[in-house]
Amino acid sequence: TNLVPGDTNNSDDIFVRDLLTNTTTRVSVSGAGNQAIGNSFSTSISANGQFVAFSSLASNLVPGDTNGATDVFVRDLFTNTTTRVSVGSAGNQGNIFTSSFPSISADGRFVAFASDATNLAPGDTNNRNDIFVRDLSTNTTTRVSVDSAGNQANNNSFAIPSISGDGRFVAFKSNAA
């Protein structure tokens, strides 16, 4: 692409345009600034523009990304760091299944996303797409596509979740009965 210098990866990338400064920044890069080796898509930006959540097939955005799956990441544009969000509370990467469709809270602390990974939260045995929220301050991941008693959904919960500005509420689509 010709949006930023040095973009030679021949992949779909994520960009942020600052309308005040008229600058365009590529977001789908590693903490070291290396371009993604794989397509990136599905974006969400925090209220002040500091944090951008996105999905990517790239395995070179963070160290240890060996699951061969689409993951969700957050790029901090102030500190130039990239963090993988689609991990369990213990830091384990999602198994070989896809995580995507991020929605980030206003302050960038919480990221809701869809995933069919079965190892991001305890008791995930429904073999269905679920909705999760990652708290980047406490480094915890919670499955939110459950009923009021905490029972898992009996069908897929997917598409693009939407998290409230304060991170308290998450709206999502589900085929659960």
Give the residues covered by each predicted segment:
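Conserved "turn/edge" positions that cap or connect secondary-structure elements
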Residues: 1-177
